[in-house]
Amino acid sequence: MSATPEEDKKPDQGAHINLKVKGQDGNEVFFRIKRSTQLKKLMNAYCDRQSVDFNSIAFLFDGRRLRAEQTPDELEMEDGDEIDAMLHQTGGGAKNGLKLFCF
């Protein structure tokens, strides 16, 4: 007798997922959220814990910027996945009025 698909699931593949948010300084903060929860909840909690403004941080998963309304389910995140928290970089303009043209 073979197992049903529900029986094949690992116990940890339930409604919750454990995620790690890693800052540029190497500091790691761990979260456990529902797979259907919008990531803005995790993002806000991270910013509160780090005492930084929400708009000053970019959150990346697999090199792609996350949007606050996305969920772990949408992104097919797995238990233990890592999100990078990066400070926004501003500036980068040319010095002395020089302009760069690409053709």
Curated annotation (Swiss-Prot):
Which is a Pfam family this sequence falls into?
Answer: Rad60-SLD
Glycyl lysine isopeptide (Gly-Lys) (interchain with K-? in acceptor proteins) cross-link, renumbered residues: G92
User: Where is it predominantly found?
Assistant: nucleus
Family matches, as InterPro entries: Rad60/SUMO-like_dom (IPR022617), Ubiquitin-like_dom (IPR000626), Ubiquitin-like_domsf (IPR029071)
Query: Which keywords, in A-to-Z order, does the entry hold?
Result: Cytoplasm, Isopeptide bond, Nucleus, Ubl conjugation pathway
Any idea where this protein resides? Nucleus; Cytoplasm
> Membrane spanning segments where?
none
Q: List the record's Gene Ontology CC terms alphabetically.
A: cytoplasm; nucleus
The Ubiquitin-like domain covers which part of the protein?
15-92
Domain of life where this protein originates: Eukaryota
Name the phenotypic consequences of knocking out this gene: No visible phenotype.
Supply the SUPFAM superfamilies for this chain.
Ubiquitin-like
Write out the similarity annotation. Belongs to the ubiquitin family. SUMO subfamily.
* Job description of the protein: Ubiquitin-like protein which can be covalently attached to target lysines as a monomer. Does not seem to be involved in protein degradation and may function as an antagonist of ubiquitin in the degradation process. Required for the massive protein sumoylation in the nucleus induced by heat shock and controlled by SIZ1.
The note filed under miscellaneous reads: Stress conditions rapidly and substantially elevates the amount of SUMO1 and SUMO2 conjugates with a concomitant reduction in the amount of free SUMO proteins. The SUMO conjugation system plays an important function in stress protection and/or repair.
Quaternary structure (record): Interacts with SAE2, SCE1, SIZ1 and MMS21. Interacts with HSFA2. Covalently attached to ABI5, FLD, GTE3, HSFA2 and ICE1.
Name the record gives this protein? Small ubiquitin-related modifier 2
Organism expressing this protein natively:
Arabidopsis thaliana (Mouse-ear cress)
